[in-house]
Regions:
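Phosphate-binding glycine-rich/basic clefts of nucleotide- and phosphate-handling proteins
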Residues: 179-241
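Conserved phosphate-binding catalytic cores of ATP/NTP-utilizing and phosphoryl-transfer enzymes
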Residues: 1-4, 128-130, 138-166, 182, ...
C-alpha cells in the first residue's frame, strides 16, 4: 500500500461510541467498530461456548471480546467504554481496542513500523495526550505519532482551512471555529450532551412504559433501536405547518 515508497499513515479516529481506522491513502475508513470491550458474566458457571480459541492444550474460552466481537454476545458480557465524553477513562481497555484494530482488522503485523495519526476532541486535558502517547509508544511501539483535533481534520478533508465545525458524537458535542488551520480555543463551545444521552433518554421513556433495562448490554440494545428504528420528525411536519 506504499505510495512513492512511503507507507501510508494509519489513522485512528476513536470516539466514545465507535472506533474508525484506516489508511491515509483511502477515501473511507477500512474499519468501523463499536468502541467496546466486553468481559464474560459468569452466571451459574456458564461460559460463551461459541467463542473458542484452539491452544496447544486444547480449546480455550475467550474471556475478553473487543469491538464487533461484542455484538452477538452483549447480553452475556459486562461492557466497558474506554472513552467517555471524549476523555480516556480506561487506558488498559483502550490499548486492547487499538491493538485489536491494528493487528486483527488492519492486518498490521508489526506496529513498530507504522506512523499514526490519532484524533481527539478539543479542550481535552494534557493527561489525555499523555495516555495516548504511553499506549502507542510504550505498549505498541509505533514509529511516529501525531495527535490532531477531529474538527481540523474535518475541514482539511474538504480542502479548506477556515470554518466552523459542529461535531456531535456519542459522548460530547462541540462547536469549533477554525481560522487558517488554527483552532480559536477561547471561542469553542462544549456541550456534554450527544448520542449517548439521547439513548439514555430513550431508556427512561421505555422504562415509563414498564420495560426494564439494568445492564450495559441493555444500553447497547436500546442504542441499536435508536440507530435503526427511531425516526426524527420535524416539529413543523407534526403540526402540519
Amino acid at each position: 500500500m506504499e505510495e512513492n515508497g512511503i507507507p501510508p499513515v494509519v489513522i485512528l479516529d476513536n470516539g466514545s461510541g465507535y472506533l474508525k481506522a484506516g489508511f491515509s491513502n483511502q477515501k473511507t475508513p477500512e474499519v468501523s467498530i463499536p468502541a467496546l470491550v466486553g468481559r464474560q458474566l459468569l452466571r451459574y458457571g456458564e461460559k460463551i461456548e461459541m467463542k473458542l480459541l484452539e491452544g496447544d492444550d486444547g480449546p480455550k474460552y475467550k474471556e475478553i471480546m473487543i469491538g464487533d466481537e461484542v455484538i452477538p454476545y452483549r447480553s452475556l458480557l459486562e461492557l466497558s467504554y474506554p472513552i467517555d465524553e471524549g476523555i480516556i477513562r480506561n487506558p488498559d481497555d483502550l490499548f486492547k481496542l487499538w491493538e485489536y484494530a491494528l493487528t486483527q482488522k488492519l492486518k498490521i503485523e508489526d506496529p513498530s513500523e507504522i506512523r499514526i495519526l490519532v484524533t481527539e476532541a478539543p479542550l481535552n486535558p494534557i493527561s489525555n495526550k499523555k495516555t495516548i502517547c504511553e499506549i502507542l509508544f510504550e505498549k505498541l511501539g509505533v514509529k511516529a505519532l501525531n495527535i490532531e483535533a477531529q474538527a481540523k481534520c474535518s475541514l482539511f478533508c474538504e480542502g479548506i482551512d477556515s470554518g466552523i465545525v459542529l461535531d456531535s458524537g456519542d459522548g460530547v458535542t462541540h462547536c469549533i471555529p477554525i481560522s487558517d488551520g488554527n483552532i480559536i480555543k477561547y471561542n469553542i463551545e462544549r456541550l456534554d450532551i450527544a448520542g449517548r444521552h439521547i439513548t439514555q433518554y430513550l431508556i427512561r421513556l421505555l422504562q415509563r412504559k414498564g420495560y426494564s433495562f439494568n445492564s450495559s448490554a441493555d444500553f447497547e440494545f436500546v442504542r441499536y433501536l435508536k440507530e435503526n428504528i427511531v425516526l426524527l420528525v420535524m416539529i413543523s411536519k407534526m403540526i402540519g405547518n
